[in-house]
Structures are given as structure tokens and as C-alpha cells.
Swiss-Prot record:
The keyword Methyltransferase does not apply. CDD domains: CobQ_N, GATase1_CobQ. GO terms for molecular function: ABC-type vitamin B12 transporter activity; catalytic activity. This is Cobyric acid synthase. Keywords: Cobalamin biosynthesis, Glutamine amidotransferase. GO terms for biological process: cobalamin biosynthetic process. It comes from the Bacteria. The active site is at C331, H429. It comes from Xanthomonas euvesicatoria pv. vesicatoria (strain 85-10) (Xanthomonas campestris pv. vesicatoria). HAMAP family: CobQ (MF_00028). Pathway: Cofactor biosynthesis; adenosylcobalamin biosynthesis. InterPro entries: Class_I_gatase-like, CobQ/CobB/MinD/ParA_Nub-bd_dom, CobQ_GATase1, CobQ_N, CobQ_synth, GATase_3, P-loop_NTPase.
Amino acid sequence: MSARVLMVQGCTSDAGKSTLVAALCRWLHRQGIAVAPFKPQNMALNSAVTVDGGEIGRAQALQAQACGLEPQTDFNPVLLKPNSDTGAQVIVHGHPVATLDAVGYHAYKATAFNAVLASHARLVERFDVVLVEGAGSPAEINLRDNDIANMGYAEAVDCAVILVADIDRGGVFAHLVGTLALLSASERARVAGVVINRFRGDLALLQPGLAWLERETGKPVLGVLPYLHGLQLDAEDAVPRNAPQEPQSQLRVVVPVLPRISNHTDVDALLAHPQVDVRLIGPGQTPPPCDLILLPGSKSTRHDLQWLRTHGWDAAIARHLRYGGKLLGICGGLQMLGTHLHDPRGIEGAAGSSPGLGWLSLQTTLQPHKQLHRVHGRLLLGDASVSGYEIHCALSSGAALARPLLQLDDGRTDGAISDDGQVLGTYVHGVFDHPMHWLHCWRGPVWRRPRHWILPRCAKPAWSVWPMRCTRIWIPRH
């Protein structure tokens, strides 16, 4: 079997590529078509653990769920996780191979592309359709040489491309016309059509612009997708721009937006909860009174620990606990809660040690080998079942671990609870993705909006406006 391959590229970052691919994956899966997602190269700090013990971008894990599949490393063969302004950890087929700066990665691209093509070859043999997501924009002139994420990949495998633009941010016609103008003749020829995303208002008022666009570019407008309010899907990098503010909140959560924040998708289920008010606090902002301070993961924990101190979070946390508040650290956040954090090999930056915040009696040493596990177990606070995943390069030890937060099904324990029950920590990401009975131990009721409810919601409008002429490009005959 050899699959039909369609690639979705965007005029900009955050144009809606991930959501559109997830929506189409869901629709095709419901038609009984064997479909798989694919992203050749992803740059993201939010990642997920696969069934084969690797690491891929969260968007591809969500798209896999839309296809009725477990996440697999072939869905995202190259993942770049920035750990500074100029460098990133390079993950190939789910496992770290190097930490490189931009020049070093440019030299490594040929090797990375071989990994991309190997994953592509396996997927097209297993599935009827492979839906591919590009990265950023295909028109970044400085990144076009040896490109493996957008048109470089499309040219190599000879697939059709659909170009998506976000009308909500403005300039949609300039984005589309300009992007097409910056492509080579062969690249432009493989663009099958364009899609306008996040439209609000009367479609009739847009029609003259669509007619002009088709005349100007020679490309059909394949669809105009509506703006979907309250769509809580996993983000890859940016912290969500709009956190709900619920005047009737029964749980108030504050999250510091760390400079190197990683896997901030841990708060997504809280953002979707109608009675949880999540406040994302950046530099220069004063943390408001709350029930829970959540310290998220970090790709550079010692750097972000110093950032917390510089911005007065150590004093804010002490005041919060003094008045009976709760404090939870996840992964890097757990490490910050200990007494010391050691990085003798320079895994996350300059080698050295840093004092922790000191709220849990444990210390952590960073190690070269990354721990990647999907886990199931029970929360020892409230006796609720949990599932999630571990992604870290650390070994923690100390008296606090004698009172763990989780009992895992593989016999291990995880995390810690302080003697007074106010301070908690865990290495398991995704603890809020499943029924949140344990939050009831602190405040308020249990509720979540599961992804299997959200995915059909984004799939329906994506397909309802998708002309049937598009299906003839790539859907296999039965």
C-alpha cells in the first residue's frame, strides 16, 4: 500500500495548521480511512511520550488521537527543544542525539532529513492517507536552504500542498499573495489551493476578496473556516493568550510564565474548567491571591529558578503558604521546590549548582540520560486514578520522597507531599488531563472537557466548508 500524502503549510506561525490537520484526521478516521499525522520537523517545548518510549510534539500526539492511534515517534521524527536563545536539544526518532546551535544544526540537517524520509517511507506503507503539517512559513528566505520542514520535504516526496492563512490577525490577502510570490516556480505549482482560517462575520462580504485572490494567484480558495471560540487544544510553544476569567470560580490558580517554560499544557485542563480561574503571571506582574500556585516544567530549570527569585516569587510563595495556600511543582517545578539543584555536566546550560526554594527536603542532580515513560497509577491524595508521562533528565533524592504523591502501577512511587500537606511535587506531566477528583480535596467540583469531545467540534466546520474538489486531490478510492 502507498498512501496519498497531503501537506498543510501556513503563511505564518499559529495560522491554524495543527488544528486543521487534527480536524481532517478526525473526519477521515470517521469515514473509515486509515489516516496518520506527520510533521517532519517540529520546534516545541511541549512534548508527549509515545508508546514506543520516545518523545514527539504535543500537536502530533493530539492528531494521533484524532486518527484513533497511539502516538508514535514516526509521526514527528525530528523535534527541536530550545534550551537557550541560540541552542536546542535535537531529538531524532524520539530520543536526544545532540544539543546544537543554529550553525551546528544547519550542518546536521542532511542527517535529520534522512530520519524524516525513513519515517515517511514507513507511514506511506502502513496508511491510506498521510496528513502532513509544515512548520512556521515556507517563505522564510533565510531558512530555505536545506529545508526539511516545508517545501524541501514536499519537493522530496512530491506531495500536494494546501496553504493556510489566519484572517483574524489581519493582512490575509498580503500573507497569501506574498507567500506564493516568494516560492519557486516548482513549489508554487504544487500548491493545490488556499484556506482562510478564523473568519468572523458575513461570508458574503468576503466573496469579492476571494474572487480577486483566485484571479491574482490562480489558486482556488478551498475553504473559509470559522473562528471557533473556546477551542482548548494543546499548544506547542506559546502560553495561551487568553485565560478564562470566571467570576464564580471555586479554584483560583496562579502560574508564573517562566522564560524557559516547558510542557505548559499541564494547565490546559484547568483552563478548560468552567469553575477554575487560571491567571498566567509574566514579568513585572504581581501574583494575585489564589488557592494554588502551580510551578510548571522548565527546559532550563536553574535559569528559571533564578528568574523566580529576581521577580520576587520566593517571597510571594512564602506569603501564599503562610495564609494557607497550596503549592504544586511539576517536573522542573518539583526540582525548584527542593533544597539544591545540581547540573555538574551542564545538561541545561552552564555547569554548576543552585539553591532551591527549600519547601521540600530533596535535592536533584541532572543526568545525561532522559527518562521517558508513560505512567498510570493512583494519586495518594484523594485516592484518584491518574495517567500521564515522564520527560526529564534528573534524579531526585531526599527525605521528602518518603511521603510520595503518586503510587504508580509499575511499583514505583513518584513525587512528594510536605508534612503539612500544603506543598506537593511530581515528575508526571498530564496529571490534570484526567478526572480531577483530587482537586476536590482542596476546593470545588470535578469537571473536564475531554479531547474526544473537542475534536469533533473542530472537525465538523473544517469539513462542512471544504469543497469536494479538494477530496479528489488526495483521498484514496475505495
